[in-house]
């Protein structure tokens, strides 16, 4: 919140137009004003380069003006929020804002002694008696010696015994049984890719003629566990239609399933949403969770209480909004691409097996690379012999760009998830935590 003040009232911030001696002479008239940064609206530190700003924006402006890279690009038509979800979103809009509020590169000072980053506020009794006010309080960040986004991470808030335990043994046993039994229906296809594409339509389990879609307004523990079970078993059923996968040792099958199920579902839900929007099954602002359930990421109520003791407002650094988690930025290119069942199946395989190979390396990497090589040959045969499209490089590039968006999002979220584990913000434990690695 920014408090407006009269232009004639003195400020606690030092400005170049007022000398320290003049400030001392007028100390009797000193009025404490609360300021926010004119760039990002966070608490300000002082007058930097001609504008009231925080230290972060001042340092950013100095780097932007003196660094080698001074040209930035905006992805949202130069209309971004400077501070959103615990981070600075757009460098271009932030630099434009710095210039708008009057920051001047001509005020930079070079070749001078460093100034200590420690703030020293007058706290003597004479000072308080003279100015008729109590000592200016230290910030919580300064007092605890922690950045603002982890000041709430005090380990005494809850003990280890208060953590919720989720036993996934029964779910893994069900998936293991499915893999041992093999595919539910025998399918005859020319190659693995075509058979997986046929299996994809079977495991989606959409009743014929059913168009009833339920709007999900709340996503809590019960809903999350239900979706996890459905998604995990769906991927297990789908992999039973992959003949090369069925030849692997059972322990490797389970290992791959536990690592790729959530990656598979991210792309599949995006594809389902793109198809549903084209067919007017859901609205343009809605996201499909399953074939018969949909949510509005702007209005859905997310219940965090079952896996953390901290309020949602304090977790904005660690967790994205629903639409960011679903990576809606990949929806537009996916909608424009309109992949066929064969193409979507290849995208799912490439995304999952590339991720698993990168994650485990070694023998798993060799297995997944062989899978990708064989499936790429099948895709080539599909383009050349069925679609009569020998020049398919452009379309393949579009498919891989969408997969790369998802992979990049996974890598970016990994660092935040590691921080969350270090500071122990979760009050939940899984019997098989490897299943939720990189789930974000």
Curated annotation (Swiss-Prot):
- Provide the taxonomic classification: Eukaryota, Metazoa, Ecdysozoa, Nematoda, Chromadorea
List each copy of the NR LBD domain by range.
184-439
- SMART domains assigned: HOLI, ZnF_C4
Give, as residue ranges, the zinc fingers classified NR C4-type. Answer: 37-57, 74-93
Q: Report the sequence similarity comment from the record.
A: Belongs to the nuclear hormone receptor family.
Which parts of this chain does the entry mark as a DNA-binding region? 34-110
Which species?
Caenorhabditis elegans
Q: Which InterPro entries match?
A: C.elegans_Orphan_NR, HNF4-like_DBD, NHR-like_dom_sf, Nucl_hrmn_rcpt_lig-bd, Znf_hrmn_rcpt, Znf_NHR/GATA
Q: Which SUPFAM superfamilies match?
A: Glucocorticoid receptor-like (DNA-binding domain), Nuclear receptor ligand-binding domain
Report which gene this protein is encoded by: nhr-130
- Which keywords does this chain's UniProt record carry? DNA-binding, Metal-binding, Nucleus, Receptor, Transcription, Transcription regulation, Zinc, Zinc-finger
Give its localization.
Nucleus
GO MF terms here are: DNA-binding transcription factor activity; RNA polymerase II cis-regulatory region sequence-specific DNA binding; zinc ion binding
- UniProt GO cellular component terms: nucleus
Q: Which PANTHER family match?
A: NUCLEAR HORMONE RECEPTOR FAMILY, NUCLEAR HORMONE RECEPTOR FAMILY-RELATED
Give the protein's function.
Answer: Orphan nuclear receptor.
Q: What is this protein called?
A: Nuclear hormone receptor family member nhr-130
């Amino acid at each position: 919140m920014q408090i407006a003040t009269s232009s004639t009232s003195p400020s606690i911030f030092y400005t170049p137009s007022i000398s320290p001696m003049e400030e001392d002479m007028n100390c009797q008239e000193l009025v404490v004003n609360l300021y926010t940064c004119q760039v990002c609206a966070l608490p300000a530190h002082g007058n930097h380069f001609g504008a009231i700003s925080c230290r972060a924006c001042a340092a950013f402006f100095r780097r932007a003006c003196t660094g080698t890279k001074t040209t930035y690009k905006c992805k949202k038509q130069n209309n971004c929020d400077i501070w959103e979800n615990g981070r600075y979103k757009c460098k271009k809009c932030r630099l434009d804002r710095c210039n708008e509020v009057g920051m001047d590169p001509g005020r930079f000072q070079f070749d001078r002694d460093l100034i200590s980053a420690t703030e020293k506020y007058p706290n003597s009794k004479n000072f308080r008696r003279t100015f008729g006010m109590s000592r200016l309080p230290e910030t919580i960040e300064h007092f605890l010696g922690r950045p603002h986004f982890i000041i709430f991470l005090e380990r005494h808030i809850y003990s280890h015994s208060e953590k919720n335990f989720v036993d996934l043994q029964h779910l893994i046993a069900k998936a293991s049984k499915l893999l041992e039994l093999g595919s539910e229906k025998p399918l005859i296809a020319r190659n693995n890719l075509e058979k997986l594409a046929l299996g994809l339509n079977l495991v989606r389990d959409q009743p014929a003629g059913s168009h009833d879609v339920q709007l999900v307004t709340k996503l809590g523990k019960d809903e999350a566990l239900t979706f996890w079970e459905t998604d995990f078993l769906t991927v297990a059923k789908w992999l039973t239609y992959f003949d090369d996968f069925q030849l692997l040792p059972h322990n490797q099958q389970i290992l791959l399933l536990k690592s790729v199920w959530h990656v598979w579902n991210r792309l599949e839900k995006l594809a389902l949403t793109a198809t549903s929007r084209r067919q007017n099954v859901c609205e343009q602002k809605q996201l499909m969770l399953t074939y018969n359930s949909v949510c509005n990421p702007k209005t859905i109520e997310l219940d965090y209480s079952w896996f953390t003791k901290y309020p949602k407002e304090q977790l904005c650094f660690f967790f994205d909004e629903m639409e960011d988690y679903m990576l809606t930025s990949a929806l537009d290119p996916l909608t424009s691409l309109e992949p066929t069942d064969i193409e979507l199946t290849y995208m799912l395989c490439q995304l999952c097996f590339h991720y698993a190979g990168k994650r485990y390396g070694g023998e798993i990497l060799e297995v997944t690379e062989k899978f990708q090589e064989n499936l790429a040959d099948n895709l080539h045969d599909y383009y050349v012999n069925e679609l009569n499209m020998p020049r398919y490089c452009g379309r393949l590039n579009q498919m891989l760009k969408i997969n790369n968006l998802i992979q990049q999002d996974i890598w970016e979220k990994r660092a935040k998830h590691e921080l969350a584990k270090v500071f122990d913000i979760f009050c939940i434990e899984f019997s098989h935590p490897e299943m939720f690695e990189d789930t974000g």
